């Protein structure tokens, strides 16, 4: 990616680090051109850059975590599928005449193990985002996902779900085609599946749009992803009639991985490479692959009945709250 493109995609809190990294590159380039040894100076600046990176990314606010989860260069479902699978074949259609590109899915192998992988798919540029409706599925997307999950259950394939959507599409056409019914059906049916189900929030986990493929035996979450009943801006617009109150809503909604693990919503936080998954997608893919294989090994030790029971009780036990004195 060109430097100018990278700068256009920088988040505000990333800019001090990017400026320091640019300075290091300039010094290194001048050193090579003039034959001057600046190894010590570069090492000192790189140490400062690493320290600054740790300071920035260890103290992000919930709203900054949301910005990072929406980063335009953040790896998508297809990025992870291609990175972690030995082979993969995409499957299409809901068998009702539609094939929603906002949800992708297919069969493949991870570490030699046959699996079904599916997830929300955002676009990488404006044209692609429009084609994929910014990762917001229509009812046909959820019906396609359920068809593929039924296929996986029939053939004994574990299901790997990647969650990354602002929300399910809420347009008039989506409502006319039964958006609520499609999501509700998926919720009901995923509880009855015999095969292991591992769901991972890789970016945004927004509302029922995330839940529509989010009922699983394990719910994993990258440390800079978010999972929420509604986007903070939408929540702020509802509660305070002002989307600018998004940061306050983000704090109240408890959208971060740390908050959600404390509340018992998610099972495991996956660490990201320093600076976020978009900085080192290959390392991020290796992290998620290791987590998937490890959890699959544990889940295969259980009988189908045990998995269904644990899955049911896992979701029934959600809803921990604290009461002020």
Swiss-Prot record:
GO terms for molecular function: acetyl-CoA carboxylase activity; ATP binding; carboxyl- or carbamoyltransferase activity. It is found in: Cytoplasm. It catalyses: N(6)-carboxybiotinyl-L-lysyl-[protein] + acetyl-CoA = N(6)-biotinyl-L-lysyl-[protein] + malonyl-CoA. GO terms for cellular component: acetyl-CoA carboxylase complex. Residues 44-298 form the CoA carboxyltransferase C-terminal domain. Pfam families: ACCA. Pathway: Lipid metabolism; malonyl-CoA biosynthesis; malonyl-CoA from acetyl-CoA: step 1/1. It is an enzyme of class 2 (transferase). Its EC number is 2.1.3.15. Keywords: ATP-binding, Cytoplasm, Fatty acid biosynthesis, Fatty acid metabolism, Lipid biosynthesis, Lipid metabolism, Nucleotide-binding, Transferase. GO terms for biological process: fatty acid biosynthetic process; malonyl-CoA biosynthetic process. Component of the acetyl coenzyme A carboxylase (ACC) complex. First, biotin carboxylase catalyzes the carboxylation of biotin on its carrier protein (BCCP) and then the CO(2) group is transferred by the carboxyltransferase to acetyl-CoA to form malonyl-CoA. NCBIfam families: accA, AccA_sub, PRK05724.1. Belongs to the AccA family. Acetyl-CoA carboxylase is a heterohexamer composed of biotin carboxyl carrier protein (AccB), biotin carboxylase (AccC) and two subunits each of ACCase subunit alpha (AccA) and ACCase subunit beta (AccD). This is Acetyl-coenzyme A carboxylase carboxyl transferase subunit alpha. The gene is accA.
């Amino acid at each position: 990616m060109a430097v100018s493109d990278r700068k256009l995609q920088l988040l505000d809190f990333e800019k001090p680090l990017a400026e320091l990294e640019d300075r290091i590159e300039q010094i290194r380039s001048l050193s090579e051109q003039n034959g001057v040894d600046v190894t010590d100076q570069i090492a000192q600046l790189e140490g400062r850059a690493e320290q600054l990176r740790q300071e920035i990314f260890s103290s992000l606010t919930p709203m900054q975590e949301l910005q990072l989860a929406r980063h335009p260069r953040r790896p998508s479902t297809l990025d992870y599928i291609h990175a972690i699978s030995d082979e993969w074949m995409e499957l299409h259609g809901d068998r009702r005449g539609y094939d929603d590109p906002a949800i992708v899915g297919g069969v493949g192998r991870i570490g030699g193990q046959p699996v079904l992988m599916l997830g929300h798919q955002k676009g990488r540029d404006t044209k692609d985002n429009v084609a994929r409706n910014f990762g917001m599925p229509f009812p046909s997307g959820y019906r396609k996902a359920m068809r593929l999950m039924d296929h996986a259950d029939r053939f004994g394939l574990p299901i790997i779900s990647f969650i990354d959507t602002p929300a399910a599409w809420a347009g008039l056409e989506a409502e006319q085609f039964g958006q609520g019914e499609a999501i509700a059906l998926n919720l009901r049916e995923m509880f009855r599946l015999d095969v292991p189900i591992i769901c991972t929030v890789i970016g945004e986990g927004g509302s029922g749009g995330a839940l529509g493929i989010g009922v699983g035996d394990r719910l994993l979450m990258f440390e800079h992803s978010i999972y929420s009943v509604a986007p903070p801006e939408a929540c702020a617009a509802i509660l305070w009639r002002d989307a600018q109150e998004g940061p306050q809503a983000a704090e109240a909604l408890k959208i971060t991985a740390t908050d959600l693990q404390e509340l018992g919503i998610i099972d495991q936080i996956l660490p990201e490479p320093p600076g976020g998954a978009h900085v080192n997608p290959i390392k991020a893919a290796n992290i998620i692959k290791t987590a998937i294989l490890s959890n699959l090994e544990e889940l295969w030790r259980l009988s189908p009945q045990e998995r269904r029971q644990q899955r049911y009780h896992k979701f029934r036990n959600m809803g921990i709250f604290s009461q002020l004195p």
